[in-house]
Amino acid sequence: ESRADASIEKFDDNNSGFFALVHAFREASKLRDLANLYTVLDRDHRYYIGSKTGRITAYADEDPTDSRSKIIKQAEFQFPEEVTGPVMGLSMTYDGWLIAATEHGYVVAMSRDLLEYHTIRLQHSEGAEAKATKPTGYGWIRNGFAIDEEGGIYIASQQHMHKVVWTGDGLSTSTTDGAWTAEYLNGWGHGTGATPSLMGFGNEDAFVVITDGEPQMNMVLFWRDEIPADWEQLP
């Protein structure tokens, strides 16, 4: 905390010019292991961060009763060897499992103590390791994701919208569990730049919404659950 305060004070004193840029670069370099900006803080004040190498780290207060106590590394989990790609998003299910998605199309569910885990790979992700369209931030998965209260996990890949289902004891991409995959327009080739958003709750029509990959983007709504029998698809 004292180092953070000192850095902020230095920016307050001088926030322009060459030396300010050097200071900003040095401070930003402390975050070089982060894979993305999507992190999670749980109800017990554990802070979870994902790395470029598939490592999840949990930080917490040294004294759980004192929020001003020293922050310590509480737990760490390295993805198994077969799960590849930088961590592109972190979130949590309504029953308290931490969910991560990697750039190469893997989804990992972890207990909050990082001792148990389940993995699955998204459909259409074959060869995702070689499908990045630019050096940074344009991989097969490049955004965060959304989770609904029924365990639906909504992930946008380079050309598809995916619903993965957390069943309570595992991850599923099977339609029998309510999972699905749908293609969207991708004229510019890089895929959507949007994090999926949930729309409709309670008795309302339930959708997941993204912008597509067209040069002039369209807003696209996907039915989250079973499509009504009387719905007429747009041409």
Predicted segment positions?
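Post-signal peptide N-terminal segment of secreted/secretory-pathway proteins
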Residues: 1-76
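Structural motif
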Residues: 3-5, 53-64, 104-112, 158-167, ...
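Long, internal scaffold/assembly segments composed of regular secondary structure
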Residues: 144-235
